[in-house]
């Protein structure tokens, strides 16, 4: 069996206080804003949106912070455009116009796919939660959400990622600013191509 030789910990042996750098505890509500602040500082992008970060509890990937930026953010940071950097990426926007493609969520999704592949995990072995936080107070745009509420629409990047890993729960949250109208969705959970919460 694949688990042969592995030590199995009893529940009382597990240190529930210890968390790895990338693991998100349910009560840790500041991880997203904190990671966005660090990313803004690292990339030298103090105000422009959209940036996105994600963390997971999947064994072997829990120490990774997945990072992404919109085309405007990547340009301001002096980073290559996604179409230049990763033209053959696994997850691509279903948007038909340039402004509806290469969003921060797609950037994060592709970093996650690359990490899964590097870890040698099959799509079915990807079990757990991916917490994604994005900086735009308007919420995740309709193009990135495409197909989640209507299977007749083309699949956006969130649905593509979710269907690729059917055992992965994707919990998305967004920066919220009083007075800013939400035009997409701010906080939601997706699994296997559908909203679950």
Q: Could you describe each region identified by the protein language model?
A:
Residues 85-139:
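Short HxH-centered metal-ligating active-site micro-motif
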Residues 123-125, 133-197:
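Active-site or metal-binding loop neighborhoods of secreted/extracellular toxin and effector enzymes
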């Amino acid at each position: 069996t694949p688990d042969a030789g592995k030590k199995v910990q009893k529940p009382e042996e597990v240190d529930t206080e210890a968390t790895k750098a990338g693991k998100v505890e349910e009560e840790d509500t500041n991880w997203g804003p904190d990671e966005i602040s660090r990313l803004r500082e690292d990339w030298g992008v103090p105000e422009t949106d959209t940036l996105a970060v994600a963390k997971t509890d999947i064994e072997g990937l829990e120490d990774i912070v997945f990072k992404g930026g919109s085309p405007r953010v990547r340009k301001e940071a002096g980073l290559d455009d996604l179409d230049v950097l990763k033209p053959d990426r696994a997850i691509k926007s279903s948007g038909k116009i340039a402004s509806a493609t290469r969003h921060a969520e797609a950037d994060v999704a592709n970093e996650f796919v690359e990490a899964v592949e590097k870890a040698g995990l099959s799509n079915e072995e990807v079990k757990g939660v991916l917490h994604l936080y994005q900086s735009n107070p308007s919420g995740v745009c309709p193009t990135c959400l495409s197909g989640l509420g209507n299977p007749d629409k083309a699949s956006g990047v969130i649905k593509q990622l979710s269907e690729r890993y059917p055992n992965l729960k994707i919990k998305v949250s967004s920066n919220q600013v009083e007075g800013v109208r939400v035009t997409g969705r701010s906080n939601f959970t997706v699994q296997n191509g559908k909203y679950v919460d």
